[in-house]
Amino acid sequence: MTDVDIKIENIVASATLGKSIDLQTVAEALENVDFNREQFPGLVYKLKEPKTAALIFGSGKLVCTGAKSIEDSKRAIKLTVDMMRTMDPDIPEEFEIKIQNIVASANLGKPLNLEAVALGLENTEYEPEQFPGLVYRLDDPKVVLLLFGSGKVVCTGAKSAEDAKLGVEKTKARLAELDLI
């Protein structure tokens, strides 16, 4: 299979603490927090290192976004929970962190004729009047690729970096098979 370099642009991960959280208390105790219940039901806690944002909800659910690696994503959630535990010692030590979405980019190295790609590949959507990219859905791995005429690609929906890379590599191989690249 054709080897392609991918760059992870964003990882979204979540955790459920199994306990409700008093957002007002958290907002008052932490720095770098945006909290306005009328605009958004949770609070946004911005970490400097790793540079991420944690969305904290009253239900005890956390969502971390902005990490460039799975390790940073997990570290950001753990740091956020540790910070919250200083205010509420009943927050559990053990909780599961789930990777929800990985967004990665790649360059196929050659321009693409998106009209020809739309005709050649199945499971595509291409409406240039609406969006300049072609949407290509794969079943294995279950990812969505946005292909652009420049040859640049954005992969979304991956649960691992390996799935993102595999999705891009399979797509490049299929395009080569059809003489579209």
From Swiss-Prot:
One Pfam family hit: TBP
**GO biological processes:** DNA-templated transcription initiation
Q: Could you confirm whether the keyword Repeat appears in this record? A: yes
- Molecular function per GO: DNA binding; DNA-binding transcription factor activity
Looking up Gene3D superfamilies in the UniProt record yields: TATA-Binding Protein
Each sequence repeat occupies one of these ranges, namely 8-84, 99-175
Highest taxon in the source lineage: Archaea
Transcription regulation found in the keyword field: yes
Keyword field: DNA-binding, Repeat, Transcription, Transcription regulation
To which protein family does this belong? Belongs to the TBP family.
Q: Which HAMAP family match?
A: TATA_bind_prot_arch (MF_00408)
The molecule here is called TATA-box-binding protein
| Organism of this sequence | Methanothermobacter thermautotrophicus (strain ATCC 29096 / DSM 1053 / JCM 10044 / NBRC 100330 / Delta H)
